């Protein structure tokens, strides 16, 4: 336990001088011990810059810090509570409770910096995780123990989709979940907490928040805090769900820290260590022989450009990508998932079975043909199409509408009750549309319903 003194403060980056023979190691946690504003502030060592001086990022606001304040080295990295005592609680990046419900009462604490499981410890699984959301289960099915990205620009429904997934899986799947709110709105965090409370699944979820208004150090590390809690559940032999909203803010916090530490920026101003930082996080999110982590990550797409370095780096790590499209949202079809852009490694006849595979590909073929015909329709009108193409367009429009679905978490806004659709029902419905069994029904009947039986009922009332 060595002591040092603050020598320089530049925003969230602080330089601290220690005796030459007691310089802290990189990632060691330091704490301000001098009385006054800033007391108890935790800092994490990022660089040793010679002469006994270490450069740190603050894990909280640097307001009130001044040169000469005394800092003590804890001799270890940031340690956070893990285990069942974290369930139903909201914590910050350091694992301190922020829900005013008293101490966590944990039995052990783990470091947030841990090595990824070794190659021989990892395991793969082809089991599917049913989400109850038609478009996802059909076109981009999730694997148990896999990684899923929800890609979308601003305001197309990433957080709502994520909340619906958590609700459906928590209720139907009865496992534990960890939710890491990385640099998102405090209001959303609050809504999410109350949503979990009303669904009676709060006692199965650990919540870790590092919001938009917090310093970059918090936002950069909060994903690791949540992941550490998920790893503990996995190592106890459980199947755990790990949700991150939003992985882009993790990258952005890294960009801010990188600039403050004086590193040269790379493409589009991102940090030069972008791929490495992403890899360090993503490689730990994996399934081992003892348990699995299934992760769902929301990925903000800057300016709707999927080739931006941040989303492009994330793509490489995922098993399934759910792409949310502004064009589909503009049609009023929610969830606004693009069935032609979304992919999954599980959509393979050997994994999902021939029936599911052919139905999904059939749906995509019809929608792709409709997309090609749209130009002709815009210029010449529907009358110039062949009978076969007219039928394709009619079915495509029904499929488009049938891909929409009322959500449980959006009942407050839509006024229609949420629907959970089992995979078998989803396949049966789309097969029927492709075979022409519902050609006589009006397309409005397919909008915002659950199973195909509801479509038939709705059509009778129209």
Curated annotation (Swiss-Prot):
Q: Where is the signal peptide?
A: none
Quickly give the catalysed reaction: ATP + H2O + 4 H(+)(in) = ADP + phosphate + 5 H(+)(out)
The GO terms this record gives for MF are:
ATP binding; ATP hydrolysis activity; proton-transporting ATP synthase activity, rotational mechanism
Q: Which InterPro entries match?
A: AAA+_ATPase, ATP-synt_VA_C, ATP_synth_F1_bsu, ATPase_a/bsu_AS, ATPase_alpha/beta_chains, ATPase_F1/V1/A1_a/bsu_N, ATPase_F1/V1/A1_a/bsu_N_sf, ATPase_F1/V1/A1_a/bsu_nucl-bd
Key words of the record? ATP synthesis, ATP-binding, Cell inner membrane, Cell membrane, CF(1), Hydrogen ion transport, Ion transport, Membrane, Nucleotide-binding, Translocase, Transport
* Gene3D superfamilies assigned to the protein according to its UniProt record, in alphabetical order: 2.40.10.170, Bovine Mitochondrial F1-atpase, Atp Synthase Beta Chain, Chain D, domain 3, P-loop containing nucleotide triphosphate hydrolases
**Record keywords: Magnesium included?**
no
Binding of ATP occurs at: 152-159
**A cellular component term, taken from the record's GO annotations:** plasma membrane
Q: How does it sit in the membrane?
A: Peripheral membrane protein
Localization in the cell: Cell inner membrane
According to the UniProt entry, what is the EC number of this protein? Answer: 7.1.2.2
Pfam families membership: ATP-synt_ab, ATP-synt_ab_N, ATP-synt_VA_C
- Subunit-level organization: F-type ATPases have 2 components, CF(1) - the catalytic core - and CF(0) - the membrane proton channel. CF(1) has five subunits: alpha(3), beta(3), gamma(1), delta(1), epsilon(1). CF(0) has three main subunits: a(1), b(2) and c(9-12). The alpha and beta chains form an alternating ring which encloses part of the gamma chain. CF(1) is attached to CF(0) by a central stalk formed by the gamma and epsilon chains, while a peripheral stalk is formed by the delta and b chains.
Annotated function = Produces ATP from ADP in the presence of a proton gradient across the membrane. The catalytic sites are hosted primarily by the beta subunits.
Q: Which HAMAP family match?
A: ATP_synth_beta_bact
Family recorded in the similarity comment? Belongs to the ATPase alpha/beta chains family.
From the Swiss-Prot or TrEMBL record, give the protein name. Answer: ATP synthase subunit beta
Which lineage ranks, top first, belong to the organism behind this chain?
Bacteria, Pseudomonadati, Pseudomonadota, Gammaproteobacteria, Aeromonadales
């Amino acid at each position: 336990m060595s002591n040092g003194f603050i020598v320089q403060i530049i925003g969230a980056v602080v330089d601290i001088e220690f005796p030459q023979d007691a310089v802290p190691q990189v990632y060691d946690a330091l704490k301000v011990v001098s009385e006054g504003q800033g007391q108890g502030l935790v800092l994490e060592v990022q660089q040793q810059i010679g002469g006994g001086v270490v450069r740190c990022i603050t894990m909280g606001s640097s307001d009130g810090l001044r040169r000469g304040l005394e800092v003590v080295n804890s001799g270890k990295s940031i340690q956070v509570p893990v285990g069942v005592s974290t369930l139903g609680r909201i914590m910050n990046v350091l694992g301190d409770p922020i829900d005013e419900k008293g101490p966590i009462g944990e039995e052990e604490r783990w470091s947030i910096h841990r090595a990824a499981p070794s190659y021989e410890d990892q395991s793969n699984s082809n089991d599917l995780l049913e989400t109850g959301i038609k478009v996802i289960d059909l076109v981009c099915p999730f694997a148990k123990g896999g990684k899923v990205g929800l890609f979308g620009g601003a305001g197309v429904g990433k957080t709502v989709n994520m909340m619906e997934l958590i609700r459906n899986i928590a209720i139907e799947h009865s496992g534990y979940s960890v939710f890491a709110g990385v640099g998102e709105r405090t209001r959303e965090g609050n809504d999410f907490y109350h949503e979990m409370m009303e669904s009676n699944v709060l006692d199965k979820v650990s919540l870790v928040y590092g919001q938009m208004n917090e310093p970059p150090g918090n936002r950069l590390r909060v994903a690791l805090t949540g992941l550490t809690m998920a790893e503990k559940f996995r190592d106890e032999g459980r199947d755990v769900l790990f949700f991150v909203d939003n992985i882009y803010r993790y990258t952005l916090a890294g960009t801010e820290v990188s600039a403050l530490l004086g590193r040269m920026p790379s493409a589009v101003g991102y940090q030069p260590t972008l791929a490495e930082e992403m890899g360090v996080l993503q490689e730990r999110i994996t399934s081992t022989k003892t348990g699995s982590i299934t992760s769902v990550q929301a990925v903000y797409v800057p300016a709707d450009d999927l080739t931006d370095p941040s989303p492009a780096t994330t793509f490489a790590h995922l098993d399934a990508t759910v792409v949310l499209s502004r064009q589909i949202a503009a049609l009023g079809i929610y969830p606004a998932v693009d069935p032609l852009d979304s992919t999954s490694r599980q959509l393979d006849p050997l994994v999902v079975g021939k029936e599911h595979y052919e139905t999904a590909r059939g749906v995509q073929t019809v929608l792709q043909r409709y997309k090609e015909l749209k130009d002709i329709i815009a210029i010449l009108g529907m009358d110039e199409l062949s009978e076969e193409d007219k039928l394709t367009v009619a079915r495509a429009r029904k499929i488009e509408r049938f891909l929409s679905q009322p959500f449980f978490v959006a009942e407050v806004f839509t006024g229609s009750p949420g629907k959970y659709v089992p995979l078998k029902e989803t396949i049966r419905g789309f097969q029927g549309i492709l075979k022409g069994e519902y050609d006589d029904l009006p397309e409005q009947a397919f909008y915002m319903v659950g199973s195909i039986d509801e479509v038939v009922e709705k059509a009778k009332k129209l």
